[in-house]
Amino acid sequence: MRMIAFFFVLIFSVQFIQAQDAGVDIKVRLEGSSASSIEAFLDNTDRSFVANTNRVIEVRNVHEGQHTLTVFAEGYAPQSIMVNASAELPVPNYNVGLMEVTYDLTEVEVVEANRSSLGMKQLKYIEVDGLYAAKKNDIVVTDEMAANISTNNSRQVFSKVAGINVQETDAGGLQMGIGVRGLDPKRTTNFNTRQDGYDISADALGYPESYYTPPLEAVEQIELVRGAASLQYGTQFGGLLNFKMKRGSEEKALEVVSRQTVGSCNYLGSFNSIGGSAGEWNYYGYFQHKQGSGWRPNTNYISNGFYAQAGRKLGNKWTVDLAFTHNYYNSQQAGGLTDRQFEVNPNVSFRDRNWFRVNWNVANVTVNGQLTKNLTINSKTFVLSSSRAALGYLGSITRTDTGGTRDLILGEFNNIGNATRLVQRFNRNGNPGAIILGSRIYQGNTRNRQGKAEGFDGPDYAFLNPENLEGSDFTFPSRNAALFTEALIPLSACWYLTPGARLEHIITQSEGYYTEQNRHPITGELLSQNSFDASTNRERNILLMGIGFVWRCRTSVEVYANASQNYRAMNFSDIYVNNPNIIIAPGMQDEKGFTIDFGAKGKLLKEVVSFDASVFMMQYRNRIGETLTTIENQEGISRIVNYRDNIADALFVGVELVEEVDVTKWLFPNAEWQLTWFNNLALVDARYQNAEVNAFNGNRVENVPVVNYKSGVNFRNGRFASGVQFSWISDQITDASNAEFFPDATVGVIPSYQVLDATVSYSWKRLKLEGSVNNIADQIYFTRRAAGYPGPGIIPAQRRMVFMTLQVKI
């Protein structure tokens, strides 16, 4: 009830800022035959208008001045006209003649104008595969960002996305770790992570960590939708993170792009892609190789990956796309440090036998079709067959690795799924609307094994006793079926309503055995060992509901609000984990809650300022977290461990503001160069409530910087482009007790840090030269305390790194 009351207070507060502008009517007359579907889009906005039964498009509430209106009709070429809105003149009428042509559905979908500002855009209200009105969303256009994309530098790539918290784990960008609104950034686990709309994480329900990140050199854009994405995409409080891959050139039969990068710490990156179109076919593929090391010892890595995609048009209304992704990398893990070791010399490493390997394979088939003039279908069927292996000494960083056998943890993931969506477009009094109906069927099977491996120094990923493991052997089957619907309902020319609901049926199981070993806390001597069989079976139905509103009477500004329920299934690591630093509580429950957004976005001062400002509240119930506790083994010896359980509820409230000033348009409107200045600020307060341990009430939630600030300047002049950005992240805590120090450094404070990055580029004909310097001031800091791999302990971030890239495009 409190959620509903708070939400409607926000909605009705919009009434105080309503205003009306001049209306414009536009008559569209077609030459030859008549078209039954006519739609128009207004420049520099995402507003669209549908013709009524008399084939008249009424554009209402446009601010005064000249605008470009682009008209589309099925079977006809697009036509753009200039229209003039003035409160002092009668409502103007325009006639537009359209010429008949042949084109396909996908061409219509991508033409609509987006609000864009140097690498940033917004999703359209109605996309081919979903509805995004009334949702906080961002599109990052990778080729337009001043960023080091060879190493997937998240700090630069997401510099204009509010509240992104980056966790650094390796120098080559092998894994991406980002979180929003105070959610844990480890391997992007709190996002529903996808590539071209299909799953790429280990297991969407029980193991949502992303061990594979698409190379940003092959990514056209990155789409982010906050918590309200739960209705269309299911579990995860963070929302949707989708990497939209590039496609082959529509103008060439063959286009080749080769990018060669060298950098600090022996970095070598080679990215080579081909793409093009031939008849009804479009294709794209790449091969990428990366190798190098971090600035610490024992951090060597090598990575190889390739991607192949082919699409074919089946007439004018259907397309079929096939894609396959492979990624392999092997990296040495330097291990963690204690607080004292980090202070004395963060360059050291006390682990030289720890390794990590990933072998990722994903295949997908996508079918897009137009069933009727206003009804489209999008269906994706994907298969994932992948593995990851962690090898090394798992003991506390306070213990010396004296050799001997190592621990090997091997995870194997085999998943298959289908997601199908129907989008029905309609118009109500000349205003566009749509209803989406979707389904998802998913089956996953994860096998996780842990045991002893050879005591060599190299990456020998083989168990000594595969039939009788010393640690554990579990299979985790999971099944998921879901139905959802969401609608974009125009209430008037200004107001839009977006109700939705999702019904989930989830089954997660586990079956296997584990071995308990009791060791002396000081000497590590094995005192006793026992094996136990274990199994679980959890079946549940989850109903998620949500509603949103959009108000947009002025074309340059819109106000949005939404409230949606969220859900996060227990991970497999919440069922069982064999790690001497972590104890799992029996009987843990799934996490539930809701998210509320209220914000405004658009352009001000004659489009000099672009902005997106919002406030949010996220209620997290049964939050799973870790606390320090003392346990006693069978021999009566006590030790302190991290205890994982449903520890409390949590309330997150925050403010997010991103603004960018076009200095050139403001001060030098006739200049050919462009200078922009952006600021990105997120303020988040996250506190525990209703905790079983009273001392936790009011404590800060883990991995939540209260202040997350980024600012930067971007400059472009012809072939030259550059960007400089500054990041400042306030301190974070890492457990629910808010402990500031622990001897093995698995919990404690992550101090505030500041980082400066810069990128420049120069293009000449077919060549492009890029240079990046990350962490210009050579700051010493860290973003993670790990309880297991790649630690345990403090994982230092990268020091100053310099990169140079030469690109050839033929």
Regions found by a protein language model. Give the residues of each.
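Structural signature of Gram-negative outer-membrane beta-barrels, strongest in the C-terminal barrel
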Residues: 315, 431-442, 474-619, 659, ...
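Short acidic/polar hinge/loop motifs at secondary-structure boundaries
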Residues: 198-226
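C-terminal beta-signal and adjacent terminal beta-strands/loops
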Residues: 626, 664, 674-675, 728-740, ...
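Membrane-embedded beta-barrel scaffold of Gram-negative outer-membrane proteins
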Residues: 368-370, 376-392, 552, 558-564, ...
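Transmembrane beta-barrel wall of Gram-negative outer-membrane proteins
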Residues: 23, 262-291, 296-332, 355-375, ...
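Gram-negative outer-membrane beta-barrel transporters
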Residues: 422, 429, 493, 614-621, ...
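Extracytoplasmic beta-strand/coil segments of soluble accessory domains associated
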Residues: 138-140, 149-202
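Face-selective signature of the C-terminal outer-membrane beta-barrel domain
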Residues: 317-327, 358-517, 615, 659
